[in-house]
Regions:
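Signal-transmission coiled-coils
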Residues: 1-145
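Short acidic DE-rich linear segments
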Residues: 142-156
Length: 156
């Protein structure tokens, strides 16, 4: 049921949440050639996971909100930390953008901010997809073997 709703059954988290960040990253990347997007960027507001789904058009948003309450605790905690980090970067970016920067300054700000955010969004995606979950007792060798086994199980 969760997998059909694009909610990871292991972590009980949905990657759809990352669209909230991907949209603003796209606008930041376009700021150099389209400075008229600055007001749209300034209109961005942080939204917690639950609030995002409450206001979204995601088909299974109610299921996503219930799954969030039962999410794997370490995954949820790690995702919340990354959300805080991304929100802090965006708060500083929005503050800087409000200072009527030159076109060159706006372009640089957009490039820098999107460059900081993209790896965090990628990492958040790996947390949502459960790619970071491994038993603590695994050695490097057993971890490598587990990864190889997983690849073959998926038919890659």
């Amino acid at each position: 049921m969760l997998a059909r709703a694009n909610i990871n059954p292991l972590t009980r988290l949905a990657t759809d949440y990352l669209n909230h960040y991907n949209e603003v990253i796209m606008l930041l990347e376009m700021l150099e050639s389209c400075p008229e997007f600055a007001p749209d960027i300034l209109g961005w507001e942080p939204r917690g996971y639950d609030e995002y789904f409450e206001k979204s058009h995601f088909k299974d948003k109610d299921l996503a909100r219930v799954a969030w309450e039962m999410a794997e605790p370490n995954s949820r905690r790690e995702l919340e930390g990354m959300i805080d980090h991304m929100n802090a970067i965006l708060a500083a970016t929005l503050d800087a953008l409000r200072h009527n920067l030159s076109p060159t300054g706006c372009a640089r700000l957009g490039t820098e901010a999107s460059g900081w955010l993209k790896p965090l969004v990628a990492r958040a995606g790996s947390v949502i997809n459960g790619e970071h979950i491994m038993p603590a007792a695994m050695t490097d060798e057993t971890a490598r073997q587990a990864m190889v086994d997983a690849v073959f199980e998926r038919g890659a």
